[in-house]
Amino acid sequence: MRRSKIVCTLGPAVDSHEQLVSLIEAGMNVARFNFSHGSHAEHQGRYERVRSAAQETGRAIGVLADLQGPKIRLETFAEGPVELERGDEFTITTEDVPGDKSICGTTYKGLPGDVSKGDQVLINDGNVELRVVEVDGPNVKTIVIEGGVISDHKGINLPGTAVNVPALSEKDVDDLRFALQMGCDLVALSFVRDAHDVNDVHKIMDEEGRRVPVIAKVEKPQAVENMEAVVAAFDGVMVARGDLAVEYPLERVPMVQKRLVELCRRNAKPVIVATQMMESMITNSRPTRAEASDVANAILDGADAVMLSAESSVGAYPIETVKTMSKIVVAAEEELLSKGLQPLVPGKKPRTQGGSVARAACEIADFLGGKGLVAFTKSGDTARRLSRYRAAQPIQAFTTDEGTRNQLSLSWGVESHVVPFVHSTDEMVELVDSELRKLKSFSEGDIVVMTAGSPPGVTGTTNMVRVHHLGG
């Protein structure tokens, strides 16, 4: 069983029912819906196909709605793409003008108030660099430092500039409401700056009467500076290395990745490493050696999941890419598991009752050579606490909630199942016997270590560890 999870971005390359079934069988655990592209009708159809494919394969597949976020962009050019050359003058304006080689509008009307002379402006993921020379009313006049081609709706980044945009744009609010009504299991918030950004998402969720975990995409320098508070406030993190490497020193991004992975594991929050993991497989049938190392090192660092973007959504080899990534992940896990239980912070003890019970369960399973860990969980927290120790035993999570089952598809080592509500520990034991016997990986007499709360079904009451011999 592969423990680490694979997140696949959906798109035209994997849009049919048959392709989605193949993607799941190849190793997809979470389907990412990128709300930067596509209409609500397209997403709805894709969602229904994912649920149908998941049902056919019998797998728990999480649906992640990734909001576009308040991305600052250029408006449009009257005659298509233009090429800027070093030394050219170029104006970005808040006025509605047809774009050309000398001027273009922007979606962000607060730009003139946020920038000043000498500020750096990056366009198209940093491929074009401008320097502000003057702010004149609605016009931000710049000079081109590094030239290149720019075109409609290309992104604008402002390294070192505090931008006064809301956490959610109007489009994000509409997309969030739609995604919740559609039935998504998780939501990713783009361009998070601090812990308070999650409040705006929760407000909309409360209005819709449905809360799901919110994943913080760390891609702004402010989020790096506030990473401990961000990890504490959100339900998980995506290390979005693409935009982060535009505004943050490129050479420091690997260290940010390692710090975030460690921090998330310590707090039992799932963490996804994303962007350019298998980029060459958009057009090639094999990854580069560097890409294989990148994926493996993310797993060795302790990431719960690795993510594919264009590789799976528009690439030429989406199924092969997932299969290849899965092989790399399994090989890295062999190395990881050979090291035994992974301490969170050497010498430090768990701070909570639930954390202490989870650690005890993992250590008992390790000492006794147990075949599995079993978590009865309503919210998924018990399973996530077990997951962070990276035990050799797979974690079987039993929950009455289908949403929790799908959300746990993002957590390392967890295989989740929807089961009827149990009223006592005796019923738990009976359920474990009947459910695990259905799985080919368990046999009569195998040792499993169970953890749950008593009374059952109450969130936050994990207080029990039980050693059980299957069928005994």
Task: Provide a role label for each language-model segment.
Residues M1-G472:
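Non-catalytic helical/linker scaffolds that mediate oligomerization, partner binding
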